[in-house]
């Protein structure tokens, strides 16, 4: 059977993570025992005569251990136990590298791009996406309005507006005359977005939210408090 493995240059991956200020000194693949199946699945596997593997490959990150600014040791951690932000960056970098290695003309879609990423790191990645070294097309979604003022052209920014029927409408900032009349560096799109210049701002009734919480407290709070005593 032909191997379905894909090659990723580990040295370059580690260098990229290091430049992104992540303390990962190496990446290793370990053979680890597979998780046991529950009784029902185990029975199905046996009835179908499926050869369930006893081991599986798992990715580990290696971190340097410091004491008084000196490296005294290193430790391994499964990628699955890394923080959400570290895993997020790892997957983004992996997608970028695979695209670079396979023609550098791919379209990569990343939902919730900034999830658990520091805003400076997210902005740096956007600059990389727009660099001359990158010929791939990235389509990203984000809730971080600070990225509106990152290294993006006006025609690259789209906002998703939802009406009272719950129907979403995708519109470009380029379509707003107010945005086109000024140079890219003369305007804060994030500030104007918060001012409602482009729409797509959620209408939140804070007083209504507080009223609901107060109503819950008055209706259930005292009764539950008595039951606990």
Residue ranges and their predicted role:
Residues 39-40, 120-121, 150-151:
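A short acidic (Asp/Glu
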Residues 111-113:
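Walker B catalytic acidic pair
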Residues 107-109:
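Walker B motif beta-strand of ABC-family P-loop ATPases
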Residues 115-119, 123:
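Conserved D-loop-proximal element of ABC-family nucleotide-binding domains
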Residues 124-229:
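C-terminal lobe/lid and adjacent interdomain/linker elements of RecA-like ASCE P-loop ATPase modules
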Residues 63, 118, 143:
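Histidine-centered active-site/metal-ligand motif
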Residues 1-99, 103, 189-229:
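Phosphate-coordinating catalytic segments in nucleotide- and nucleic-acid-processing enzymes
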């Amino acid at each position: 059977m032909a191997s379905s493995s894909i090659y990723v240059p580990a040295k370059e991956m580690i260098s990229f993570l290091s430049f992104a200020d992540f303390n990962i000194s190496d990446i290793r693949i370990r053979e680890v025992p597979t998780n046991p199946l529950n009784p029902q699945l185990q029975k199905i596997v046996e009835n179908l005569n499926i050869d369930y593997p006893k081991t599986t490959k798992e990715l580990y990150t290696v971190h340097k251990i410091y004491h008084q600014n000196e490296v005294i040791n290193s430790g391994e951690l499964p990628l699955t136990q890394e923080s959400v932000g570290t895993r997020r960056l790892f997957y983004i970098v992996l997608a970028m590298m695979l695209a670079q290695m396979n023609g550098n003309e791919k379209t990569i879609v990343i939902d919730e791009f900034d999830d658990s990423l520091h805003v400076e790191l997210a902005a740096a990645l956007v600059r990389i996406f727009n660099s001359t070294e990158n010929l791939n097309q990235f389509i990203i979604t984000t809730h971080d309005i600070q990225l509106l003022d990152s290294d993006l052209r006006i025609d690259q920014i789209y906002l998703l507006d939802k009406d009272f029927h719950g129907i979403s409408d995708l519109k470009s900032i380029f379509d707003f005359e107010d945005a086109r009349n000024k140079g890219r560096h003369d305007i804060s799109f994030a500030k104007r977005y918060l001012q409602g210049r482009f729409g797509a701002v959620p209408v939140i009734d804070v007083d209504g939210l507080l009223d609901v919480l107060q109503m819950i407290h008055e209706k259930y709070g005292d009764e539950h408090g008595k039951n606990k005593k």
